Amino acid sequence: MNDACLLFPASKELDSQNVAVILADDMKHSESILQLGSGAPRKGFPLTSSPLLPMVTPWPFSQDHAAPTLYSLLVAYYKSFQSQKLDPPKWLWQCLGDPSGRKCMVTQFLLPPLGQVRISCYRNLTSIVICQAVDPWENNNEADWRKNPMARPRIKCDHALCFKVVYEGTLWRPHDQKCWLIRLTEGHKYGMEELSPGDWKILQESRPYPYGPIGEDPNLQYAVGVKMKVIGGPLTSTVLALKALSFHRVNICNMDNPSLGEGHAPLRYSHALKAYGPQYGSCEERVWQTATKCIGPEEENYWCEYDHRGFFPMVPNKLSPTWVRHAAPYCIQRFATPYDLQYFANELLPPGFSITTPKGVSYTSDRRLHYGNEGTLQEYNENCDKVKRGYDEISSSDYSDEN
């Protein structure tokens, strides 16, 4: 448990069953735990006042109730097969026991581009474990990757992607539920490292390639472009949660994108990645989060210790301190969808200018031209005269109607 600023819930807040499931199961690979949902501490804190689960996922999950999250998983599961004109296999449930000996109903399935999902339903608790590194079509899992660094998977299990969320309650309870978010690290249970090359091959052959062409399919954009841009950051869990919340807030503001309980990909991810911010953090982001009281003033409130990955140490090098790392300019990826390109054309280019893809498709900026700060004095005066004539025509028309 590396993130000291996130406190574990006291045992008196939970019954024995919850303690066994949340704390005892796979503690070794749990990065941190954050209480969310009903009754969460620090009311008004951005993470607890939002209904969104602060984890980077293809569509938003709920932190207030298990039902919207599970329903979105079910919808996405069926849509992923129907989009390929395949009959979706039924969810198979098994009655199993957890490490504490408690019985629960368990199902596990693969859902691109999200990853491997494991759902455990107890009498008064719902647990979901998601490993986003499991993608046999766009990630590699070679037999000797532990010995050969060059064979390591390009998308590893990381606390920015892999997580366990536990809701205190069942699907049929109408009121808001307590929720705990546990970030998981490399080697966690029910993750990629438990799959052998044979398992990987079976999953890969279980269905056709589920993604569309580069630059056209937002699912492929998420599977590669988004995951590669969020893993590996030497940032604390609170910082990652704040960045994930910004990621979802931008997406959910577009009415065409999925909301809570809707399991499908949005139109684009580039603007959400831009809101997510620098993958490895920056001094600008740290200053903003500190100034808004989202994190503490100490460096360890922003950067975390990742010695085993070769990133920044907890105590920075005086010749190269972490707080001088500036955010790099945001770049458009080749996975950007047509909606992304049109968005950036409108945002970055003057009216009439365009972006042309290698296939010859052009996206022309149609934003409004502001003559006050984008025109010459002559153009500005001509525009003022045009606006004045328009007002005069309206005034004369109203005067003639009155007569």
Curated annotation (Swiss-Prot):
This is Protein Bel-2. It comes from Simian foamy virus type 1 (SFVmac). It holds the Pfam family Foamy_BEL. Bel-2 expression is low. Belongs to the spumavirus protein Bel-2 family. GO terms for biological process: positive regulation of DNA-templated transcription; viral process. The lineage of its organism: Viruses, Riboviria, Pararnavirae, Artverviricota, Revtraviricetes. InterPro entries: Foamy_BEL.
